[in-house]
């Protein structure tokens, strides 16, 4: 499946659901209490993070989407902490505050990144369902996706009123469901239960065939547009009426903490669909996002550079032949990782030992090496009739196969000034007997804070010499 990064800044999403505060007390444990056989945690840091529906909205905002959040809280310090965190991240917050009840707080006591204890402070909210529905309806103008983030804590009382209000306006409805009655989500465009939640409703599935069959019946019974079952280490399965199931394997490189992974899935789905992505592509992006977030501690968000890097890795463009847009994204991510970008250019018509040695030396000047290759027309202009021997596609394919080369791109001009203006490498490398001021593009690179270095060439090793030698053969 071909993936690309959506324009998330075009993603207006309304999130409605159970808001909670994830509170962390971080410290270390070095002894057992003399009062009882329990560890003593010396608390060194306290941290608050938005959780539940608030985490969904925060994830959408972290991707650059326009997130609006409607939820229910108490009139207390925890609600104030949530509102501050969300507002600072750009989320438009609409809380229905109930003075007689506390904001839901999940307090986790951590010792050296290990969770020792979780304490929940909560009561089911006595929500004014009519007032909440009226507020939601007043916010639907301009929204592309409505997310129902349901943790069963009482914020969502009349699901159907919200679903029908959105559908009447052509707004897609996504629901992260809870409980045994999925009928309350009837008519939703997509629901995203995890496997345990799904089997709690349809019964245990012996294999994927049974999972798909029961999913199809559920979609038909509830008039759902689609069903996405998240399956932990087994990835996720997308089912749509009239389409074969789409199974996506898990993409986590390391699982550290699964807290909030479901929030990440539905938030990425919502942002991608609001940005115009088709559902299979949006699901694939959500799968990559989940693989990133489970490698983080606690309730967490992912950034655009993190997701972009995962997309590039998935598409095999972490290395190889790239177009300009792909290359600029790869450079941005490399710089975010603190990597130094090296650039060199040439015709590389017949790759020889001198080229290989030179490229290895160039790569040693930094962390990533870009090789820009003259296209066929420019090689002919520079080298004369009969050149190039190899087409630009073949030349780039050979270069991309070298261990020293990270990215290869072609250019149509005789010299790479235009490309250098766009790429702005940290180091420009050229081989030969040049002064630095004679290197084409040196002024451009130095104007942007880069360096220019000249490397020696391997003697008695040149493409022109090889071509002439071949032509002299009888």
Swiss-Prot record:
EC number from the UniProt entry: 2.7.1.167, 2.7.7.70
Annotated signal peptide: none
InterPro entries: Bifunc_HldE (IPR023030), Carboh/pur_kinase_PfkB_CS (IPR002173), Cyt_trans-like (IPR004821), PfkB_dom (IPR011611), RfaE_dom_I (IPR011913), RfaE_dom_II (IPR011914), Ribokinase-like (IPR029056), Rossmann-like_a/b/a_fold (IPR014729)
Family: In the N-terminal section; belongs to the carbohydrate kinase PfkB family. In the C-terminal section; belongs to the cytidylyltransferase family.
Reactions it catalyzes: D-glycero-beta-D-manno-heptose 7-phosphate + ATP = D-glycero-beta-D-manno-heptose 1,7-bisphosphate + ADP + H(+); D-glycero-beta-D-manno-heptose 1-phosphate + ATP + H(+) = ADP-D-glycero-beta-D-manno-heptose + diphosphate
This protein's GO CC annotations: cytosol
Function per UniProt: Catalyzes the ADP transfer from ATP to D-glycero-beta-D-manno-heptose 1-phosphate, yielding ADP-D-glycero-beta-D-manno-heptose.
Annotated positions binding ATP: 194-197
BP terms from Gene Ontology: ADP-L-glycero-beta-D-manno-heptose biosynthetic process
Region (Cytidylyltransferase): 343-474
Subunit composition and interactions: Homodimer.
Listed pathway(s): Nucleotide-sugar biosynthesis; ADP-L-glycero-beta-D-manno-heptose biosynthesis; ADP-L-glycero-beta-D-manno-heptose from D-glycero-beta-D-manno-heptose 7-phosphate: step 1/4; Nucleotide-sugar biosynthesis; ADP-L-glycero-beta-D-manno-heptose biosynthesis; ADP-L-glycero-beta-D-manno-heptose from D-glycero-beta-D-manno-heptose 7-phosphate: step 3/4
Alphabetical UniProt keywords: ATP-binding, Carbohydrate metabolism, Kinase, Multifunctional enzyme, Nucleotide-binding, Nucleotidyltransferase, Transferase
An example molecular function term from Gene Ontology annotations: ATP binding
Alphabetized HAMAP family for the sequence: HldE
Protein name listed in UniProt: Bifunctional protein HldE
Start and end residues of each stretch annotated as Ribokinase: 1-317
Gene3D superfamilies per the UniProt record, alphabetical: 3.40.1190.20, HUPs
Catalytic residue list: 263
PROSITE patterns membership: PFKB_KINASES_1
